[in-house]
């Protein structure tokens, strides 16, 4: 399984890197900016894209707005956010992202999320 994490929080990035390192069947790429994430999404195929909504300069919202709804639906994009603003969350649901994943989260919740999007063989 190939995962892209686009997250500017270094603690979350490190946890994800360690987590994926323990899972031999997960190839996890971690980038710390929306712009770099956008480039990776355009140039590589991922089974799951975990995208932080609030990042400086080029945010997760900017990344989402770079794609059409149909493109996002095909890409399995899940938003990572600590936001509890119902308006923002509702707008994100209407963009084609698969779901909103609230921070903070447990490793158990992360495992459940990853398994949900694992390609079926």
Task: Report the location of each language-model feature.
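Hydrophobic/aromatic residues positioned on beta-strands within the core alpha/beta folds
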Residues: 79-80
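As written
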Residues: 60, 92-98
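Conserved acidic carboxylate
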Residues: 7
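Two-component/phosphorelay signaling modules centered on CheY-like receiver
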Residues: 10-29
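Active-site residues of response regulator receiver
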Residues: 52
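Helix N-cap/capping motif at the beta->alpha junctions
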Residues: 17, 30-39, 60
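C-terminal output helix
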Residues: 105-114
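The feature encodes the CheY-like receiver
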Residues: 56, 70
């Amino acid at each position: 399984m190939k995962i892209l994490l686009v997250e500017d929080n270094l603690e979350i990035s490190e946890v994800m890197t360690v987590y994926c390192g323990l899972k031999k069947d997960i190839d996890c790429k971690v980038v710390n900016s929306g712009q770099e994430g956008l480039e990776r999404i355009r140039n590589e195929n991922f089974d799951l894209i975990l995208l932080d909504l609030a990042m400086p300069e080029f945010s997760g919202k900017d990344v989402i707005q770079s794609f059409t709804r149909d493109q996002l639906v095909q890409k399995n994009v899940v938003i990572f956010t600590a936001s509890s603003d119902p308006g923002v969350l509702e707008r994100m649901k209407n963009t084609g992202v698969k779901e909103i994943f609230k921070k903070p989260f447990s490793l158990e919740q992360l495992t459940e999320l990853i398994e949900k999007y694992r390609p079926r063989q």
